[in-house]
Amino acid sequence: MKKIKILILGSSGSLGSQLVTDLKNNYQLIKISRKNFFFDENFDQLKKLIIKIKPSFIINCIAILGLKFCENNLKETLKFNYKLPKKVSDFSSKNNIKFIHFSSEAVFIGNKKGKIYREDDKGNPTTCYGISKFKADRYLIKKKNTLVVRLPLLYGPTNKNQIVSKLVSAVKNNKKIHVSTDVYSTPVYTPFVSSFIKNFVLVNSSFFFKKKIIHISTNNLISIYFFIKKIVKIIKKEIYLFPVKDSFFNKENENVIKPKYLGLKTKFVQCIDKTVINKKLISGLIK
């Protein structure tokens, strides 16, 4: 019996690599990333690949991240965060391919303390990153065979994850970490997201017709500072955390209104752990 083909875009990142781990035994995976595949301006090479392999699903984990980088590289940000999913969605809808695209809490304005955003809340991004993701969201919800999955802050078991990599670096190099006290999210464990895609989305076609946008979230709002403190407590290592206001990191982009009070709320896909951090979070990385 032939395995169903899935094309994973961005297979080397934190979420992409987790999906590869979870799906490789049950599906035939074709994995590409910006490191090993040339994405031309019109994505013609990608289109040729899709025609050749004929996947049943395409999962897009590619995203240009980082406030400073996105603000200074708008063309590249729009290319990968907006034009790429737009192109893939156009082609997928015409060829009966189901397309899963990951979006972000950054599509919201994030200026009201305590506010957690639902699927039906109106997007109003303030950064180039948020704008690029929001443009994609607005376009994709009109396309058939397409599902937008919005995610809050992700944390995971590998050093490809931004939070974990900072902690690993701090332990190994005996360095201090500056952490924002006034930025909030509803952090979700990366393997939970991957597991949900595997066990629910890929086996239930109604997601692509009845639900155009879903949030995966804990519904549990927490500051980044207290979240990282919870991780530090679990790993029982001496790490120097310095609480700072987020403006400490934003000195070069003072004119950019960065959202502080984000986080996603959903009645549909709620992580049951309520941000209870898995003790295997950084297994093998910090000893």
Give the positions of each predicted feature.
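Adenosine-cofactor binding site in Rossmann-like domains, unifying the SAM/SAH pocket
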Residues: 28-48
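Catalytic helix-loop patch of NAD(P)-dependent Rossmann-fold dehydrogenases
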Residues: 79, 83-84, 107-149, 153-155
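NAD(P)-dependent short-chain dehydrogenase/reductase
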Residues: 138-185, 190-199
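Mid/C-terminal beta-alpha module of Rossmann-like enzyme folds, strongest
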Residues: 196, 203-253
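C-terminal amphipathic/interface module of NAD(P)-dependent oxidoreductases
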Residues: 239, 257-287
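NAD(P)H-binding glycine-rich loop region in Rossmannoid oxidoreductase-like domains
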Residues: 43-80
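NAD(P)-cofactor binding segment of oxidoreductase domains
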Residues: 72-100
